[in-house]
Amino acid sequence: MGKSESQMDITDINTPKPKKKQRWTPLEISLSVLVLLLTIIAVTMIALYATYDDGICKSSDCIKSAARLIQNMDATTEPCTDFFKYACGGWLKRNVIPETSSRYGNFDILRDELEVVLKDVLQEPKTEDIVAVQKAKALYRSCINESAIDSRGGEPLLKLLPDIYGWPVATENWEQKYGASWTAEKAIAQLNSKYGKKVLINLFVGTDDKNSVNHVIHIDQPRLGLPSRDYYECTGIYKEACTAYVDFMISVARLIRQEERLPIDENQLALEMNKVMELEKEIANATAKPEDRNDPMLLYNKMTLAQIQNNFSLEINGKPFSWLNFTNEIMSTVNISITNEEDVVVYAPEYLTKLKPILTKYSARDLQNLMSWRFIMDLVSSLSRTYKESRNAFRKALYGTTSETATWRRCANYVNGNMENAVGRLYVEAAFAGESKHVVEDLIAQIREVFIQTLDDLTWMDAETKKRAEEKALAIKERIGYPDDIVSNDNKLNNEYLELNYKEDEYFENIIQNLKFSQSKQLKKLREKVDKDEWISGAAVVNAFYSSGRNQIVFPAGILQPPFFSAQQSNSLNYGGIGMVIGHEITHGFDDNGRNFNKDGDLVDWWTQQSASNFKEQSQCMVYQYGNFSWDLAGGQHLNGINTLGENIADNGGLGQAYRAYQNYIKKNGEEKLLPGLDLNHKQLFFLNFAQVWCGTYRPEYAVNSIKTDVHSPGNFRIIGTLQNSAEFSEAFHCRKNSYMNPEKKCRVW
């Protein structure tokens, strides 16, 4: 057919004929060989570098961990001289206690960060929110609604006072208004049954220690208006607090009288409030010291109401006090009838004996002034700015803070404390990595196993008691993260808060509603079985717990984060962080309190006499050790080695178990890669991370407060005391014998 129509055009290029090829010169050959050699070397180096492992972890998580550890520590301090300064010196230089805080530390920073998460989830309205969550958000909005709160002044409180027989000092003609109807039984019971406020006599419904599936009525000494009985000495370091306390009473009484348009007699206010202080001082002196209340066996005194009437008769306002009427006044609010045969556990027989001569000295007016005040003082910070400010000097004397906590923080905490499951749901949905649960379960299994293996090393405990200790350890139930129900069972969560209905412009009434709801719920338990599966903590909490009555350990979602735990951080840090916390909580089942309860949570002596005696002897070592620490921030006072014993036993046991579990991990999985920028191996990093959990400091006022009220040793002594007893620590840091961190005498219980 001839040429194709789509034929391509070809351009013909005439190329010249090549010249004759030239030979390479020696220089060119040499250079070519050199280039070839350099290329081979470069390729080899690249290949080697790509596969070379210098043993240092360079992941972003490792870099973050290393940066945190380096920032917090002071490497110029000798670790064997003062490990607190070595581990926390950098933290102390970089951090100042906020004006709103009584203390500040890594624990508090985690709590601050958790509060930010709570604020975000509580202030965000969502159309798909279930009713329980809607209620939590409404409660939060009512709490931050400062304009509504301020506009009401003290009116919500004034409306409430007649319900509790008024406050005599702020009432005209109190005797005429209330005197005829006032009885001690009714007045004390009203505060208790409606609002959960226990003054003079602390009656409550709780688990029966000796039969932990049942509830029983307990009678105990009351809490005080000041942090501890020591404050009522009102001299030296306690003088300012006593003065501020009485001034606080007078200020609030004055504000109420002003609002009620009543005449103000300053002398009369001072006279009556000083009388309240005098009465409370006597009550405080009648209470037992904490160190005398450490043995649950001695604390437990079960008797009938008839026996209480016989053993602890009281006379108030010239009339005999009826224990039966008093108890029925409280329990009738939840439709429970009590007879003289009702069993009651008395925790404070000595207090009730000492109470009798005190109460005969004071009039109904004096007693009601104290009782109403103790209720009012709790509510002042829920009123307008003027009322809040009346508390400033008192707050400063007790906590050293010069500013109030930010409203949103206080409100986030308040809602979390009252609706822990609704808030817990919001928190875990926003911030909790679910895979953490399985990793922590595995850690618990490892540390429980180490605890049981360690029993074999104990020479002070006989075989019979060891066997029972093992049974108890195996029976410990664990709770990790959060109860599944709070996320998966909408109906159950809604039903939990069914009776609660909040108004956004009535914060005070919402608080009262919560008090009534919570107290009613607790009183109703008297005729119910104990729910042993119930969680003893909400999810949005940076803490961990052990319940002796349930033999249960709890690790809420809030604590499962760095520095305690991360599935991505080095295992040495996890074992030194959450591993130590797990060991600590397990050991609580065997401390000076927990050891008295059996595997089912009942108060039963399961120890042979010899083992019990040896336990006390071993413990005494720690009582002396921690009791010899003096705290400069608390005016040089010594720690109370008896009151902090349980926590110190748990710290020491927990650290030892976690370290042994980490050694087992290394044997099984091999050494981990080192962290960048730190000239420390992983054994050393284990102890460093443990210590940095406790970096922090206190205001002097709060140090004075906590040394009397906190069952934990201050953070610096938790580090020093525990590590002084650890031979493994001294080995890891090569501490010479008898250096400060490596004393020859070491204490060990578990």
UniProtKB/Swiss-Prot annotation:
Residues 1-20 are annotated as: Disordered. Inhibited in a dose dependent manner by opiorphin. Activated by K49-P1-20, a twenty-residue synthetic peptide shortened from the snake B.asper myotoxin II. Myristoylation is a determinant of membrane targeting. Glycosylation at Asn-628 is necessary both for surface expression and neutral endopeptidase activity. Its main location: membrane. Its cofactor is Zn(2+). Changing C621R: In CMT2T; decrease of protein expression. The active site is at E585, D651. Keywords: Cell membrane, Charcot-Marie-Tooth disease, Disease variant, Disulfide bond, Glycoprotein, Hydrolase, Lipoprotein, Membrane, Metal-binding, Metalloprotease, Myristate, Neurodegeneration, Neuropathy, Phosphoprotein, Protease, Signal-anchor, Spinocerebellar ataxia, Transmembrane, Transmembrane helix, Zinc. The chain crosses the membrane at residues 29-51. Disulfide bonds join C57-C62, C80-C735, C88-C695, C143-C411, C234-C242, C621-C747. One of its GO terms (molecular function) is metalloendopeptidase activity. Residues 56-750 form the Peptidase M13 domain. Zn(2+) binds at H584, H588, E647. A motif (Stop-transfer sequence) lies at residues 16-23. It comes from the Eukaryota. Binds 1 zinc ion per subunit. One of its GO terms (cellular component) is cell surface. Important cell surface marker in the diagnostic of human acute lymphocytic leukemia. This is Neprilysin. It comes from Homo sapiens. The lineage of its organism: Eukaryota, Metazoa, Chordata, Craniata, Vertebrata.
